[in-house]
Amino acid sequence: MRRYLVAAAVGAAMAMAGSATAAEVEVKMLNKGAEGVMVFEPALIKLAPGDSVKFVSTDKGHNAETIKGMLPDGGTTFVGKMGEDVAVKFDQAGIYGIKCAPHYGMGMVAMVVVGTPANEEQAKAVPQVGKAKQVFATLFERLAANKTAAK
């Protein structure tokens, strides 16, 4: 009987060691943050496939939504409601561009990088408006620096 209990305990431990739970990252939508005004904080989010992001409407008057064309093939689009939190699960590897619709031109954008992205050049080619162009250039530079540092 004791051997069976030990075997069952070892089997259960091995099953638990092989499983992983998905993570949820919280991103604040702010009128003013460490990087300036009208920002997502953090603006560069790295995830594993299956992880989620909860966009939190810390300051009212913001939303989070995908930018047309700036997501991988098979990636899910979403549009969060104004002034409300929205949680999004990212299953498809790739780069996702996120914007706050009313403050997009002011540079209120974020980049979600899931797994190993295959759509980086496609994402870079999407035209951006106003200050969003500069913010995305900075985010792509940070992404490249992180890749170089990881080698």
Give the location of each predicted region.
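Positively charged n-region of N-terminal signal peptides that target proteins for export
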Residues: 1-4
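Extracytoplasmic copper-binding redox domains, predominantly the cupredoxin/blue-copper superfamily
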Residues: 20-151
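General helical structural elements
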Residues: 6-7, 146
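Bacterial N-terminal signal peptides
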Residues: 7-15
